[in-house]
Swiss-Prot record:
<dbReference type="InterPro" id="IPR013155">
    <property type="entry name" value="M/V/L/I-tRNA-synth_anticd-bd"/>
</dbReference>
<feature type="binding site">
    <location>
        <position position="653"/>
    </location>
    <ligand>
        <name>ATP</name>
    </ligand>
</feature>
<keyword id="KW-0547">Nucleotide-binding</keyword>
<dbReference type="GO" id="GO:0005737">
    <property type="term" value="C:cytoplasm"/>
</dbReference>
<dbReference type="Pfam" id="PF08264">
    <property type="entry name" value="Anticodon_1"/>
</dbReference>
<dbReference type="InterPro" id="IPR020791">
    <property type="entry name" value="Leu-tRNA-lgase_arc"/>
</dbReference>
<keyword id="KW-0648">Protein biosynthesis</keyword>
<dbReference type="InterPro" id="IPR014729">
    <property type="entry name" value="Rossmann-like_a/b/a_fold"/>
</dbReference>
<protein>
    <recommendedName>
        <fullName>Leucine--tRNA ligase</fullName>
        <ecNumber>6.1.1.4</ecNumber>
    </recommendedName>
</protein>
<dbReference type="GO" id="GO:0004823">
    <property type="term" value="F:leucine-tRNA ligase activity"/>
</dbReference>
<keyword id="KW-0067">ATP-binding</keyword>
<dbReference type="GO" id="GO:0005524">
    <property type="term" value="F:ATP binding"/>
</dbReference>
<dbReference type="InterPro" id="IPR009008">
    <property type="entry name" value="Val/Leu/Ile-tRNA-synth_edit"/>
</dbReference>
<dbReference type="InterPro" id="IPR001412">
    <property type="entry name" value="aa-tRNA-synth_I_CS"/>
</dbReference>
<keyword id="KW-0963">Cytoplasm</keyword>
<dbReference type="GO" id="GO:0002161">
    <property type="term" value="F:aminoacyl-tRNA deacylase activity"/>
</dbReference>
<keyword id="KW-0436">Ligase</keyword>
Length: 967
């Protein structure tokens, strides 16, 4: 058979689908009980989609196709997300001729150079990648209703008016507030940064450091060294301070409110703190070595402690000033021990080594399992030799900090006897109230980079608009909605629950980027994670909006909140529809149809997305639905999928390690790509794309096409007399139908592919081996029937090939709309399956014996089946599943009692092996019927139950495990 032209077949059927509009559902006379509405997070158009995206979008398409074939009226729409600063950031970097950005877009995304330079205008980026993404989705065979397509931002005014309505509703309910809050901030562009505004570091948490002001006397002036700590309770155990002698520090006037103080902090800290409600005026700049050997006063205990040198102090972390608590901090203990051995360093800074030698550790916390100094003990336990043992030190630190926080009891007045977890909060509060403590926010890692290419800082913003996800009543509604929802996989539910708990105010608007202006404060633009939470409702009316727009009959400015209120929130009302006709210029009939569509499709049945959107989009999706819509319209389910890697490596466009979705289709064909990514892992697991495996799968699909094409020539005559092997094939086909159906109902795409493709392929191979030489009506009936069912089972995965084969089979219409197969009741036959498995098992046993025993030129196999009394033993054990109960029952039989000792051994072994699943078959009959086949396959003579006991094997025979002797 010539090589299959996947591309030609795909283009043929994509054209026919679009022309016939088979994926544009009509709701007229369609029962709501049989509707199925599924959506997936619309893609962000800052570049080409890669094969990781292919997984995210193929899963819901497979499910949509499956449900459509089950007879459901399916809506699977698509739109494009262009909100936010990323696209603007790309345009800016291209304008500035940033080499990395130009390389990505020219060499990785393969944008022609003449088009690339037009990307200085962000609108051109949007147009280019929107067209490319739609082409990719069509080429992938996605069964999308394109009549509902739209894109976000004010560039598409109807959707922008919908977002305005959403925000008015949130504001009316008190869920949008103006206030002060810490946000990630691009200091160059001057805008808050949401998750989607970051090039790197979206998962990096923000830490809250307590700055404790240690006093340094410089003549008459008091200067503060604010030591940054995550453990303020340990201030009582400070023995010294650490500064990096090589780092640059500044003396600065720090003004917060009306208070002005002089601080010594790292140069980097001065910059960061200037964004956190402080005015910073640098007075002097110097190296840390200037302060080494000086003493500062602990503001809590009054103790004078020395400043010691430590190159491990990172000036770019918090203030660059670190307090040392060696009794409870492994790093501090080891650093002190190292310094005691480095007298040359101490003498360099005119420090008397005896001062360091005589530092006394201060025990603060009683911790079960440890003595006075837990950090010292943990360091010794792990065998830490010096500061170079960083991994062990990190481990020791985590162990001690966690144990002390959760189980430690504080020993120092006035907090003695209280748990450390409580004391930590009390001391932080006390420090703040006394003016000797302040808060500084810092990223846990440094790699937080905006889409503009700038390193982010944390800024305290005033007069910023927030969505108040911390509202207790709103949280309760979100919890209630989550309880009612189906979450796939169920293991993700706990993550959603945790996120609902910790979500707080989130900045919802910024000053730059594409988007919808905040309706009551248009200087602000709604950000990308805030305009993408309820657009699934907009899909339900978007085809009408698009049609009106194309006909020039829509004035977006007339799409007022009153219009959206009626469509989405109110009861049907003819009078209201007439009023809205007057106000909007849209006919009352179309307004009625819009409302009908929304009421028909909502609630959303399934929302699909990758797991990285759980902490933001998917949880915001729940919150915003419960805020705006009545309970009957709350979403019903969320399905979360895993990520993709490429040849074992994380995909990264900056490193060029990325495979564009469209390139994968060009190289392999859409059906190959679809089946491959569905077969690699269940939807919730990560997958790894490997080119060699894709090539192998392509050959298997070509074999599938070849087989069905061959079977299409057969006639499937009814009422033919079937042999047992024919019945076996139909029974196995039933199993594949059920297995595929059950798996797809739970989004278990890998299991579904195993059943629909690999299991049937393997069963068919066996059937063709077992029926070799036959060309009768029964075999033709089985193969023609199998072809009809197999093509339909595979249609959700490989729709183009299956349409082509469906046409060959003479199927009516499109296979995409054909009836999903149901198991045929009369085909079920567990006995025949057990008999066929028995034949396979015996053949495998014979081959194994020959191989293990290294028998050359084997000529005969003597097979001894179990005596009838052994069947009775096995059946009783399967029923009782207990040694005493089974023996008690068996010993009631006089004949069996004579074999008591032998039976006891058998029962003991069966229970140990948990051999409880048995189905009695006539082993000798099955073997005699399969004798010719076994002899042909194995090339040896088969002798069944001869009178002669060859090799004394006969007594070893057990039910379904015959004794075998080879000669």
């Amino acid at each position: 058979m010539p090589e299959l032209n996947f591309k030609a077949i795909e283009e043929k059927w994509q054209k026919r689908w679009l022309e016939a509009k088979i994926f544009e559902p009509n709701i007229k006379d369609k029962p709501k009980e049989k509707k199925f509405y599924i959506t997936v997070a619309f893609p962000y158009l800052s570049g080409h989609l890669h094969v990781g995206h292919a997984r995210t979008y193929t899963i819901p398409d497979v499910i949509a196709r499956f449900k459509r074939m089950q007879g459901y009226n399916v809506l699977f729409p698509m739109a494009w997300h262009i909100t936010g600063s990323p696209i603007v950031g790309i345009a800016e970097r291209i304008k500035n001729r940033d080499p990395q950005t130009i390389w990505i877009y020219r060499d990785v995304y393969k944008v022609p150079e003449d088009i690339l330079w037009t990307f200085e205008d962000p609108v051109n980026i949007v147009k280019y990648f929107m067209k490319a993404a739609k082409e990719t989705f069509i080429r992938a065979g996605f069964s999308v209703d394109w009549s509902r397509e739209f894109y976000t931002t004010s560039l598409f005014p109807p959707f922008s008016k919908f977002i305005e309505w959403q925000f008015w509703k949130l504001k009316e309910k008190g869920y949008i507030v103006k206030g002060t809050h810490r946000v990630r901030w691009d200091p160059v562009v001057g805008t808050p940064l949401g998750d989607h505004d970051l090039m790197d570091g979206e998962d990096v948490p923000i830490l809250e450091y307590i700055l404790i002001k240690f006093e340094l006397k410089e003549g008459e002036e008091t200067v503060y060294l604010p030591a940054a700590t995550l453990r303020p309770e340990t201030v009582y155990g400070v023995t010294n301070m650490w500064l990096n002698p090589e780092a640059t520090y500044v003396k600065a006037k720090v003004k917060k409110g009306d208070k002005v103080e002089t601080w010594i902090i790292s140069k980097e800290a001065a910059y960061k703190l200037s964004f956190q409600d402080r005015e910073i005026e640098v007075v002097e700049e110097f190296k840390g070595e200037k302060l080494i050997g000086k003493f500062v006063r602990n503001p809590v205990t009054g103790d004078e402690v020395i400043i010691l040198p430590a190159e491990f102090v990172d000036p770019d972390n918090a203030t660059g000033v670190v307090m040392s608590v060696p009794a409870h901090a492994p790093f501090d203990h080891v650093a002190l021990e190292d310094l005691k051995k480095q007298t040359d360093i101490l003498l360099k800074y005119d420090i008397d080594p005896r001062i360091v030698e005589n530092i006394t550790y201060i025990s603060l916390i009683k911790l079960e399992g440890y003595g006075e100094f837990p950090a010292v003990e943990e360091v010794q336990k792990l065998g830490v030799k010096s500061q170079k043992d960083k991994d062990k030190l990190e481990q020791a630190t985590k162990t001690i900090y966690r144990a002390e926080y959760h189980k430690g009891i504080f020993k120092i007045p006035p907090y003695e006897g209280k748990p450390v977890s409580e004391v930590k909060e009390l001391i932080a509060k006390d420090l703040m109230e006394k003016g000797i403590g302040e808060i500084m926010y810092e990223f846990a890692e440094k790699n937080v980079i905006s889409r503009f290419g700038n390193r982010a800082v944390i800024k305290i913003i005033h007069d910023q608009w927030f969505i108040d996800y911390g509202n207790p009543e709103w949280k309760e509604k979100a919890r209630e909605a989550l309880k009612r929802m189906k979450i796939l996989p169920e293991s993700r539910r706990a993550q959603f629950e945790a996120i609902i708990e910790w979500l707080d105010k989130k900045a919802c608007a910024r000053k730059v980027g594409l988007g919808t202006p905040l309706p009551w404060d248009p200087d602000w633009v709604i950000e990308s994670l805030s305009d993408s939470t309820i657009y699934m409702a907009y899909y339900t009316i978007s085809r009408h909006i698009n049609k009106l727009r194309e006909e020039g009959k829509l004035d977006p400015e007339k799409l007022t909140p009153e219009f959206f209120d009626y469509i989405f929130l109110e009861e049907f009302d003819e009078k209201k529809e007439k009023e809205l006709e007057e106000k909007t210029g849209i006919s009352a009939e179309i307004i009625h149809e819009m409302k009908e569509e929304f009421e028909y499709w909502y609630p959303l049945d399934w929302r699909c997305s990758a797991k990285d959107l759980i902490p933001n989009h998917l949880t915001f999706f729940i919150f915003n639905h419960v805020a705006i819509f009545p309970e009957k319209h709350w979403p019903k389910g969320i399905a979360v999928n895993g990520f993709g890697t490429l040849e074992g490596q994380k995909m990264s466009k900056s490193k060029g390690n990325v495979l564009n979705f469209i390139d994968a289709i060009e190289e392999n064909g859409a059906d190959v790509v679809r089946l491959y990514i569905m077969s690699l892992a269940e939807h919730d697991s990560d997958f790894d794309w490997r080119r060699k495996e894709v090539g192998r799968l392509r050959k298997q699909i070509e074999r599938f096409y070849e087989l069905i094409s061959q079977f299409a020539e057969y006639e499937a005559r009814e009422n033919v007399e079937l042999k047992d092997i024919d019945k076996w094939m139909l029974h196995r086909l039933n199993k594949a139908i059920k297995g595929t159906t059950d798996a797809l109902e739970e989004f278990r795409t890998r299991t579904a592919v195993q059943w629909a493709f690999y299991t049937i392929m393997n069963d068919l191979r066996w059937y063709l081996r077992r029926t070799e030489g036959r060309d009768d009506e029964a075999k033709r009936y089985v193969l023609r029937t199998l072809a009809d069912i197999w093509v339909r089972l595979m249609a959700p995965f490989t729709p183009h090939i299956c349409e082509e084969l469906w046409e060959k089979l003479g199927g009516e219409g499109f296979v995409s709309l054909a009836k999903w197969p149901d198991p045929v009741e009369e085909w079920w036959n567990e006995t025949i399956e057990a008999e066929e498995e028995y034949v396979k098992s015996v053949m495998e046993d014979i081959k194994e014996i020959i191989e293990v025993a290294k028998i050359e030129n084997a000529r005969r196999a003597y097979i001894y089946t179990a005596e009838d009394w052994k069947w009775k033993v096995v059946e009783v054990v399967a029923e009782k599943r207990d040694f005493k109960a089974a023996m008690s029952e068996l010993m009631k039989d006089q004949e069996l009692r004579k074999r008591g000792k032998e039976i006891a051994k058998i029962v003991e072994r069966l229970i140990k092996d948990r051999a409880f699943e048995v189905k009695r078959i006539d082993e000798e009959k099955v073997l005699r019927e399969a004798k010719d086949f076994i002899e042909k396959e194995l090339g040896i003579e088969i002798i069944i139950n001869p009178s002669e006991d060859k090799g004394g094997k006969k007594k070893q025979a057990m039910p379904l495990k015959p004794a075998i002797f080879i000669e």
